[in-house]
């Protein structure tokens, strides 16, 4: 989940914690965004890791008798040649900090975000989505030191509504991505953001989750991707059903960068 330390969230860490307590959660992990070189104006958003740890560290102590707070980060990996060196430098600075949990995500490709319509304009949607998976493959091979790959099929969320692309067309490259993730000892998340918005499937698609499990993948975290309080812990019951159907018996929580497994 994301707080005001993320450029796209307006909810304070305190509100996230209070909401989680009201909903009966015993533990949460705040994973604010660090997308280097994005937005394009570097003065618009700068992730201040010292302020982040100071704030969440105080809240962890303040709330310790009511809920466990783990401190995480979602780092945005990129493959564009003109920014890779900058990303590498920032990643090297952040990955060694005492986070409990680090999500490595691909949000951006070709200096654009699939969330925005202009990412797709002037491009053949299938080719664009394939290029995004190719960028994701580069990222999971190039970067190390993260715990799980976030919302693996992120770009598929935002394919234009008038376009239908069969997910099975991407299974070959997805299999290669999953193989790299498993071989490196990392995992996946099931991201319930789409479920919270009324869609029938999470990210990644259950087809991908089943493939991951069949290939021997075991590390699976559950994230709401909440940017607003109303989505804290949203659709975790549905996520449990999906994971069980995909063959999982346990979900994972990271503490001090170590995975702990809990029965679903």
Where are each of the predicted segments found?
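Hydrophobic faces of well-ordered beta-strands that scaffold small-molecule active sites
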Residues: 1, 28-30, 69-73, 102-104, ...
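Charged catalytic cores and adjacent phosphate/nucleic-acid-binding surfaces used
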Residues: 1-2, 9, 13, 24, ...
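An N-terminally biased module of ancient metal coordination in phosphate/nucleic-acid-related enzymes
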Residues: 1-86, 158-160, 164-168, 192, ...
